[in-house]
Amino acid sequence: MPNIKITDRLSNGETLLLDGGTGSELQRRGANVLKGAINKKDATSQQKTWAWSATTNIEFSDVVRQVHKDYLRVGADIIISNNFWTIPSRMNSIGLGDRWEEYATAAGENAVSARDEENPEAYVAGGIAAPTMQSLQEVPVPDIEYMGEKAFHKEYYDHAKLLADIGVDLILAEYLGFVSDSVAAVDACAEVGLPVFLGIRHIGQNGKMQYHNANQNNTTEETLNELAKALEGHPVDAILLMCSNPEAISAGLPIIRDSFNGPIGAYPNIGYNPTGPITNSPTLTNQLPSGGKDILQTQNYSPSRLAEFATKWKKTGAQIIGGCCATGPEHIMAMKPIVKD
């Protein structure tokens, strides 16, 4: 366990290196991250990710731990546990709802043990992704509206408490797309007594959030300014823009910097299709530790190109920089000199 609290390092002005994608890296290394992902009601319909990568925490635990270690070896200060969708609602979707705690515990323990073995001074962020059950609706609505306040709170609190008991250093409530969900998730996670970081997904290149607010037929996108205002007085220790393309993050960071009084960060998606096949990319054959296997489209954002974005983000004020879907250890290694300079 680290001797210095992560919040103290951020308060002192340090910039920390976050890890890269976990689920996509697991898939690239041959782990089955799509167990239960096909919509069984209609096998010809578009695949859904359901509990994407959750089952790997037990079935491919050695690969999960190795991915964590590889990120630490290239310099990551923070790794995110592979708890992305080990939450009850998502595990229910593949018939494993009664075992969610088993898979969630395995994910947390995999990350903590990898950290303890590789670099005890690194931080483990207990990652909890938004249920996004509203994505099943014709008109998306916030999870808290779809699930109800009580069920939403329990989903987050129970997961955060489990991870805190395992020994993670902070909670990362990530993949949030609505303001109301973001505020409620932060409040629930903070009850376990750890720092809480917030990850906002799929922002547009106009710097706005993913969804329109469907209430009252309001078709105005929620904004990052509105998010920051709504979070005033709530226990959020950092806001990160995530799972968005680098250009969108570049547009959004100045907005969140100017409206939020706290550390900000970025971890972009660089083109990964979670239900797509693994392909061989000769472009990256010599760069990938897996020997050339590449998830779709990453050749558009080489490690060196992503490092150029990291330079901009650091100048903008980002203190936590890493990667999301399709980024791998090679991307994090390329960003290290910029982030840690």
Spell out what each predicted region is.
Residues 1-341:
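Domain-level signal for soluble alpha/beta catalytic cores
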